[in-house]
UniProtKB/Swiss-Prot annotation:
Superkingdom, natural source: Archaea
Organism name: Haloferax volcanii (strain ATCC 29605 / DSM 3757 / JCM 8879 / NBRC 14742 / NCIMB 2012 / VKM B-1768 / DS2) (Halobacterium volcanii)
Residues bound to ATP: G107, E108, F109, G110, A111, G112, K113, S114
Name the record gives this protein: DNA repair and recombination protein RadA
One GO-annotated biological process of the protein: DNA recombination
Function: Involved in DNA repair and in homologous recombination. Binds and assembles on single-stranded DNA to form a nucleoprotein filament. Hydrolyzes ATP in a ssDNA-dependent manner and promotes DNA strand exchange between homologous DNA molecules. In addition to its role in homologous recombination plays a critical role in maintenance and/or replication of some plasmids, but not in plasmid transformation.
Gene for this chain: radA
Disruption phenotype: Decreased growth rate, loss of homologous recombination, increased sensitivity to DNA damaging agents such as UV light and ethylmethane sulfonate (EMS). Loss of maintenance and/or replication of pHH1 and pHV2 (but not pHK2) replicon-containing plasmids.
Residue runs in coiled coils: none
Listed SUPFAM superfamilies: P-loop containing nucleoside triphosphate hydrolases (SSF52540), Rad51 N-terminal domain-like (SSF47794)
UniProt family annotation: Belongs to the eukaryotic RecA-like protein family.
Length: 343
């Protein structure tokens, strides 16, 4: 959105428009979904002025009013579904990972949560006819789990048809049987994954803001950001805020972080995939004592909640625990050297 457009909002002159753009609010829509306190702090303007600007931006962007159910249905046609390339899992999830939503995957260590983030960082780059979204990926890494070598394995592990279609889509010459061609393709996949390591919870929150800027820069390019992975969402919050005395502050910061991520999904039609750690409830005498970290804040904010469990060997059980429009259920997949594969 051009700066002159922002100046048409009440109370926005050239100086204020500059502050808004510098703070990442360069469109009506990005201003419309901001809170008055957030806009006031980042753009250094009064809270009353910020409220007026936000209300005017909502009118200009047609955001925040009531819609009919049919209008919502029409808008939902724009939502993308990212295939896991595993029919059983895709069927469980109603077609795959949904954009404009937060999908949480939780499970014990070694269950394969990071493997899912790597695989979907590859799959999102596939052409739509192959189940991808033809877009790039942002990867916020809080546990030092991102491995380029794993991306290499998973690209090579794609079906021949998907590899051929990807070469054509990127207008790359060569054969999938040629090692130099595959190396070049792997490099091209890696170039479209933007990785940042989060050193603590404050840095992780800052990286979400940077991710919004990066997604905005790529919005009108050939490779828009269609997937944002956070692996893991809760590790730093869990380590830094210990005990009941700090629980309220932890949950407040986690809540803000989740809403920042959701905003990216809404603004840029991006799928948000977060992994979560678990704890064991010693008071549970019946059923599975494994519980996800994050409490009700994360439970309410996640649109889709997946519990990943180990089974025999390389088998993993993908259990859909919560979804607004899908029944609970399970699917089985395998975690192999070539990536995630059907049973």
């Amino acid at each position: 959105m051009a700066e002159d457009d922002l100046e048409s909002l009440p109370g926005v002159g050239p100086a204020t428009a500059d502050k808004l753009v510098e703070s990442g609010y360069d469109s009506y829509q990005s201003i419309a979904v901001a809170s008055p306190g957030e806009l006031s702090n980042k753009a250094d303007i009064g809270s009353s002025t910020a409220s007026d600007i936000i209300n005017a931006a909502r009118d200009a962007a047609d955001v925040g009013g009531f819609e009919t159910g049919s209008m919502v249905l029409e808008r939902r046609q724009q939502i993308g579904k990212l295939s896991w390339q595993i029919d059983e899992v895709d069927e469980l999830l109603g077609g795959g990972l949904e954009t404009q939503s937060i999908t949480e995957v939780y499970g014990e260590f070694g269950a394969g949560k990071s493997q899912i983030t790597h695989q979907l960082a590859v799959n999102v780059q596939l052409p739509p006819e192959q189940g991808g979204l033809g877009g790039g990926c942002i990867f916020i890494d809080s546990e030092d789990t991102f491995r380029p070598e794993r991306i290499d394995d998973m690209v090579r592990g794609l079906e021949d048809e998907a590899l051929e279609a990807t070469l054509d889509d990127r207008e790359m010459e060569g054969s999938i049987d040629d090692e130099e061609t595959i190396k070049a393709l792997v490099d091209d996949f890696l170039d479209k994954i933007h990785v940042a390591k989060a050193f603590n919870s404050n840095h992780q929150i800052l990286l979400a803001e940077k991710a919004k800027e990066l997604a905005g820069e790529h919005e009108d390019t050939e490779w828009p950001v269609r997937l944002l992975c956070v692996d893991s969402l809760t590790a730093h919050f869990r380590a830094e805020y210990v005990g009941r005395g700090e629980l309220a502050e932890r949950q407040q910061k986690l809540n803000k972080h989740l809403h920042d991520l959701m905003r990216i999904g809404d603004l840029f039609n991006t799928g948000i995939l977060v992994t979560n750690q678990v704890s064991s409830n010693p008071d549970s005498y019946f059923g599975d004592p494994t519980q996800p970290i994050g409490g009700n804040i994360l439970g309410h904010t996640s649109t889709f909640r997946i519990y990943l469990r180990k089974s025999k060997g390389d088998k993993r059980i993908v259990r859909l625990v919560d979804a607004p429009n899908l029944a609970d259920g399970e699917a089985i997949m395998r975690v192999q050297d070539a990536g995630l594969k059907p049973e």
